[in-house]
Amino acid sequence: MMKKRLLCIAAAVLMVLAAVFAFGCEKQFPSEQEVLKSHLDKYCRENGEKIIEKYKNYFSGAQCSACYVDNSALVIEFRFDEKISDPEFQQRFAPDMENIIAEFRPIAQEIADASEITYTGVVLMFLDSEGQQVQSIPIGANNSNMIVDFSD
């Protein structure tokens, strides 16, 4: 009778320990999305001002105005000093799109390498003078799973 009681107590203690361990493990390992956001936040804090300064006048008529994290990408925002439509944007920048992507791909690659998550990248966000979105261009790393879709 005493052995059964000790076995029951031991089993109960083990179940409690297992539950505590399982709960503790759940809290110790952040999700892939949390890891990515942490890497992106850190990258933005350390490099945001440099990116804004470097690309301040990269696009004719648009200033690099912000660098921030949104979803699973680093957003580099450009604001035009005029009202511009999507067709006007396409006419001005579509012929140079390969060079634009090549210019920003190293940033996407650096982020993907640091976080070891391939579906991340950079999104170039273009706003007109009134703050309305004109175009967004997602750029993934070289081996990225990030979907690049220029149709909007």
Segments (PLM) and residue ranges:
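C-terminal motif of bacterial Sec signal peptides marking the signal peptidase cleavage site
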Residues: 21-24
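Alpha-helix boundary/N-cap detector
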Residues: 31-46, 88-99
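Hydrophobic core
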Residues: 15-19
